[in-house]
Amino acid sequence: MEAGEPEGLVVRALRQVSGYGRQGRSWTSPEGGLYCSLLLRPQVAPRELPTLSLVVGMAVRRALVALAGARAEEAVRIKWPNDVVLAQKARYARFPEATEIRDLGFSESGKELGQKNRAQRLFCANEGDACSARDGRAPDFAKLCGISLEAHGGGVCVGVGVNVLPPDKRPDVGGKNRPAYVADLADSVAAPAVAVEAVLEALLAAFAPLYGVWRRNGFAPLVDEFNAYSSLNGQNVRMVDRADYLL
C-alpha cells in the first residue's frame, strides 16, 4: 500500500496461523475458509468510510445468494457494523448436525423473497459485537463472515473472512462467535479449493458494482437494500463501551 499499488489488488491466504481481530483477539482460520484482503483507494468523503464495511457485507450476501439461491436469500443477513450472519431459524438452514457433505450443489441466482427477520430484543456491546437477548439467551444467528477495514498508506485494506467449509470437528464456540458455514446452505459441498474459489469469484463479482455506486454516490443509494437484510431489524440495541458505559 505504501509503495503506491493501485486499487484492485486481492491477496488471499489458504489459512492463517497468527490471525487476530479487534483488541488483539486471536482468530482461528483453518483451511476451508476464504481469507482475503482487498486494496482500495476510494476518493470519498471521510464520513462515508465507515459504511464501506456494510457495502462489503452486502456483496458477501449477494454472492451467497448467487451461489445458494433461495436458501441464502432467506437465511443470510448483514449484521452491523462488520459481520454477515446466518439466521438459525430460517427454514432452509442446516447447522452442526448436518455433517455429511460431499459435492458443491450451488444453484443459479436466487429469487428475491424479501422476508423480514423475526423481531427479538437484543442488547449489543462494543459496536454491536457482543449481543444477547434480554433473558440471556444467545442471538438467533451464527457468524458466516467477518469484515475489517484498516486505513494505511493512502488506501484502505479490506479484510474478508468467510466460513465456507466446516472443519472435521466444528469449534465449540457459543454466543456472538458461534460459526456458520456456506456449506450449511448447500445440499452438498465440493473439494475445498473448488468451493472457496467459487465464493471468492462470486464475492468479487458482487462487490464491483456495489463499490462503484458507493464510490460515486455514497451509501445513500444502498440504504434500502441494507435495511431489507439487516439482522437487527425490529430489535432494540444498546451500545456500551469497554467499561460498560452506555454510549
Task: Label each region the model flagged.
Residues 185-245:
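Conserved, helical-rich catalytic subdomain that frames metal- and/or nucleotide-binding sites
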Residues 1-75, 89-96, 100-106, 113-115, ...:
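N-terminal lobe of the biotin/lipoate ligase/transferase fold
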Residues 88, 148-153:
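Short, low-complexity Ser/Thr-rich regulatory SLiMs
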Residues 153-186:
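Short, acidic (Asp/Glu-rich) active-site segment that either coordinates a divalent metal cofactor
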Residues 12-14, 37-39, 79, 148-150, ...:
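Short beta-strand segments
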Residues 80-86:
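Glycine- and Gly-Pro-enriched alpha-helical subdomains that act as flexible
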Residues 145:
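Cytosolic ligand/metal-binding cores
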